[in-house]
């Protein structure tokens, strides 16, 4: 793997009942100002900065890129809240990062109109898109959002050649129905293709859904099985440390494990120039 410099601002376009970052995503920027003093403007050199210093910075795009360079990060990830809420800042930073040879990774709910998505997509190297369910009623009840714009975003990213992976948080009583998961996987196979990874993540009680239990592992295994039956070649299970092969990438041809993982660590890597070391089949993804 490689190092990514992650950042966010306050605010989000959704109101997810289960948000794990609600302390920043459900607040305005002025509500998250550091209480220790006025904002500081970043000035080089950055080598002497501490975490406390960074917490008080008013960072312009050039500051973000400078810090990413100083930390020798291969990419910048726009994450934690929702980059759509600070679109212009994300766009300007992405553009500058591309000029400086740093990759851009967008972590998003996907609720964006097509024109700005295409404008931003020119500077994206990868994206993580949350597909929070496959029912309009559930989307509104759980997230105060709509499903169709997210499906449009997936199609747009695919048409632009931006690599993306899909995350589906399986929330008990909301998005854990096998029929919903099956319809979602069938749609992805037909409209996006078999090579886009999908991660079924385990829900843990958060924010306004603290009375719900964590997602049963059996439900996640069933979701993974449904995805594979629908023809999706790379189906994973997330947020379940220690679950055997939950995060392993298998070659779709010879079925050998080509990338093994333990939470955030890569424990085995059997690819050569993006191809399976055992049978030379091309494995979808970004491997450089």
Summary of predicted features, one role per range:
Residues 63-66, 88-99, 115, 119-122, ...:
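Alpha-helical scaffolding segments of alpha/beta enzyme cores, especially the outer helices
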Residues 69-92, 138-151, 168-183, 189:
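Conserved glycine-rich "GG(E/T)P / GGGxP" loop and the immediately following alpha-helix
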Residues 1-126:
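Conserved Radical SAM active-site core
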Residues 75-77, 103-105, 126-128, 163-165, ...:
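Structural preference for beta-strand elements that scaffold enzyme active sites
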Residues 25-28, 83-85, 111-117, 127-144, ...:
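Conserved radical SAM core fold
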Residues 173-288:
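Auxiliary Fe-S-binding modules of radical SAM enzymes
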Residues 71, 100, 160, 192-194, ...:
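Helix C-cap/helix->beta junction micro-motif
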Residues 50-54, 140-146, 212-213:
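Short glycine-enriched, charge-decorated loop/helix-capping segments at active-site entrances
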């Amino acid at each position: 793997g490689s190092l990514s410099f992650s950042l966010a601002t306050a605010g989000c376009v959704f109101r997810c009942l289960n948000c794990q970052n609600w302390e920043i995503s459900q607040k305005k920027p002025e509500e998250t100002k550091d209480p220790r003093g006025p904002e500081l403007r970043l000035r080089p050199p950055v080598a002497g900065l501490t975490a406390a210093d960074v917490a008080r910075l008013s960072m312009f795009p050039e500051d973000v890129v400078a810090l990413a360079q100083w930390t020798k990060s291969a990419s910048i990830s726009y994450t934690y809240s929702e980059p759509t809420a600070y679109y212009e800042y994300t766009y300007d930073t992405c553009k500058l990062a591309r000029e400086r040879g740093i990759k851009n990774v967008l972590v998003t709910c996907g609720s964006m109109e097509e024109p700005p998505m295409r404008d931003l997509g020119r500077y994206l190297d990868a994206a993580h898109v949350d597909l929070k369910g496959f029912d309009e009623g559930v989307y509104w009840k759980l997230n105060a959002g709509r499903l169709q714009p997210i499906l449009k975003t997936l199609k747009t990213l695919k048409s632009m050649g931006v690599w993306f992976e899909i995350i589906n948080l399986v929330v008990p009583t909301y998005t854990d129905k096998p029929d919903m998961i099956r319809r979602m996987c069938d749609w992805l196979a037909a409209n996006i293709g078999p090579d886009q990874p999908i991660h079924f993540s385990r829900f843990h009680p958060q924010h306004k859904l603290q009375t719900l239990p964590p997602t049963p592992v059996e439900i996640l295994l069933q979701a993974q099985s449904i995805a594979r039956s629908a023809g999706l070649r790379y189906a994973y299970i997330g947020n379940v440390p220690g679950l055997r092969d939950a995060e392993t990438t298998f070659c779709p041809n010879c079925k050998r494990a080509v990338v093994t993982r333990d939470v955030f660590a890569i424990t085995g890597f059997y690819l050569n120039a993006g191809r399976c070391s055992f049978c030379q089949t091309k494995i979808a993804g970004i491997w450089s």
